């Protein structure tokens, strides 16, 4: 992300209000694409539903199905996202670009198979109709490829291409939704298909961008699986962070204010709407991290580590460390202050602004919104500190902080269900506070003796960690090689093909007629 941050930084050098708004718009979309796209699509579709007079029950079911599909796809990809990003960075550093596209399709294949089985089982018992279930599964698979592609797209630094695919997805989805409503199609099914088509356009656009920048090759698509074993803490960090961010929503659905929409599809409008709007307040920190914290910190970080790699003297290393940590402390302080100002401003104005909107906010919802604004603000700053921990390869600290975030947020939210409804948002707030404090303390202790961490905590002999994922990659390589050998040799591969060959040989061909 630092690379694309430098590209976006050029936009911020342009003067004028419009140029500044344009720069923040680019940065916001690039940095928070998945969730922001989900929010904007849902809002756009709901506006069309309101204008067309779609029933409230159908609107609620549509929102639940899209929300479930969005959260399920983000949770699955969160386990693979960081190791895949690390694999991508390593391949680019080693100038092995021919490994990138095969790994993209290999990672997609693993996630699509696992996700289709798991989410398909849920949909089977969810109470959705066959068509609704198939549409949800279709949308789920498209989302997986999109979220996985986001990791690869940041490497090409084409923020305009990302923006165009983003805008095309929203435009196509809204146009298809309008056409479905005008044709009188069933609203839930028609709008689900429209959203899937919108995400499908984004998928096709992103794949074209990837094929434009990376070479095609016949390298193994399963090489990246070794990185899952090698960097399992990264996978767990991504998963725990995602669980901490979204688990409280699911737990609230099972509480007293939860509403059963249909079958296993639940919602809690009094809590979900404030949470959705409060989540948008972290955009400032997400954008600031990419265009300010990383852009200003990374050059100092690079210079410091280059002194170790290129034989720098002790005096230069000490000076470079002081400059790097001073820059880091300054940027983190500014980042926290910006988030504090945004959170305070939003809380101050929310009663006036939200009451004027047709969202049906009551006193309980206003309370949830204020609580969740503080919680998401703490999460945003804590996540920034977590990413800096990953810069210093403190994977254990990252797993500890994210694991406590997921555990405390989930457990505290479950306990809050036993209390008055006014306290429901405090579970997530407590988890976010623990996340922020633990990550900050870990960063402080880790950087207090940085040369020791770099020189003395590394293994003397480099070893490759192998495990279940590495073995899975080897098995898939053997299967693929066997398949390819049969294809080249002309032998039928499947039972269906063998049956066709037997029928052909019996009635029309000879034994040597391949």
Label the model's feature ranges.
Residues 20-36, 163, 220-247, 332-341:
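Hydrophobic faces of transmembrane alpha-helices in multi-pass small-molecule transporters and flippases
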Residues 63-89, 242, 246, 275-300:
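Small-residue-rich midsections of specific transmembrane alpha-helices
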Residues 67-72, 108-112, 121-153, 342-350, ...:
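Alpha-helical transmembrane segments of multi-pass membrane proteins
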Residues 165-211, 422-445:
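Hydrophobic alpha-helical transmembrane segments
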Residues 1-42, 60, 64, 225-234, ...:
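N-terminal membrane topogenesis motif
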Residues 194-198, 202-294:
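Transmembrane helical elements of multi-pass membrane transporters/channels
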Residues 153-179, 389-411:
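Alpha-helical transmembrane segments of multi-pass membrane transporters/permeases
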Residues 92-104, 272-356:
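Specific pore-lining/lateral-gate transmembrane helices of multi-pass inner-membrane transport
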């Amino acid at each position: 992300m630092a690379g694309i941050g430098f590209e976006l930084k050029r936009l911020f050098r342009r003067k004028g209000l419009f140029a500044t708004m344009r720069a923040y718009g680019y940065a916001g979309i690039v940095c928070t694409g998945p969730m922001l796209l989900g929010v904007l699509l849902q809002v756009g579709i709901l506006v069309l539903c309101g204008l067309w007079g779609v029933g409230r029950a159908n609107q609620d079911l549509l929102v639940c199905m899209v929300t479930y599909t969005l959260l399920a796809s983000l949770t699955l990809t969160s386990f693979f996202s960081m190791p895949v990003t690390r694999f991508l960075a390593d391949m680019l550093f080693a100038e092995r670009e021919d490994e990138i596209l095969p790994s993209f399709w290999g990672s997609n294949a693993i996630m699509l198979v696992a996700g289709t089985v798991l989410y398909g089982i849920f949909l089977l018992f969810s109470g959705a109709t066959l068509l609704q279930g198939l549409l949800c599964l279709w949308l789920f698979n498209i989302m997986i490829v999109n979220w996985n592609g986001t990791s690869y797209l940041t490497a090409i630094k084409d923020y305009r291409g990302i923006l165009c695919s983003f805008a095309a997805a929203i435009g196509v989805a809204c146009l298809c939704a309008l056409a479905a409503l005008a044709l009188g199609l069933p609203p839930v099914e028609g709008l689900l298909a429209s959203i899937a088509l919108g995400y499908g356009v984004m998928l096709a656009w992103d794949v074209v961008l990837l094929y434009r920048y990376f070479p095609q090759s016949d390298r193994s698509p399963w090489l990246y699986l070794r990185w899952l074993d090698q960097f399992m803490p990264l996978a767990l960090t991504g998963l725990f962070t995602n669980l901490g961010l979204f688990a409280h929503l699911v737990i609230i659905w099972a509480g007293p204010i939860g509403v059963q929409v249909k079958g296993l599809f639940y919602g809690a409008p009094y809590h979900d709407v404030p949470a959705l709007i409060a989540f948008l307040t972290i955009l400032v920190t997400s954008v600031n991290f990419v265009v300010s914290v990383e852009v200003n910190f990374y050059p100092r970080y690079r210079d410091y580590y280059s002194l170790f790699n290129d034989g720098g003297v002790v005096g230069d290393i000490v000076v470079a460390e002081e400059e790097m940590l001073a820059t880091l402390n300054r940027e983190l302080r500014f980042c926290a202050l910006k988030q504090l100002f945004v959170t305070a401003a939003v809380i101050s104005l929310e009663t006036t602004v939200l009451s004027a909107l047709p969202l049906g906010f009551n006193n309980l919802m206003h309370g949830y919104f204020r609580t969740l604004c503080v919680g998401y603000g703490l999460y945003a700053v804590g996540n920034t500190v977590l990413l800096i921990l990953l810069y210093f390869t403190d994977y254990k600290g990252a797993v500890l902080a994210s694991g406590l975030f997921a555990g405390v947020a989930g457990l505290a939210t479950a306990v809050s269900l036993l209390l008055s409804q006014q306290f429901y948002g405090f579970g997530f707030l407590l988890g976010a506070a623990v996340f922020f404090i633990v990550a900050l303390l870990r960063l402080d202790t880790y950087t207090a003796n940085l040369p020791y961490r770099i020189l003395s905590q590394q293994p003397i002999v480099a070893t490759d960690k192998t495990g279940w994922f590495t073995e899975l990659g080897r098995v898939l390589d053997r299967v693929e090689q066997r398949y390819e050998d049969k294809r080249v040799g002309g032998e039928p591969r499947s039972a269906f093909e063998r049956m066709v060959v037997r029928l052909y040989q019996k009635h029309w061909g000879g034994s040597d007629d391949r």
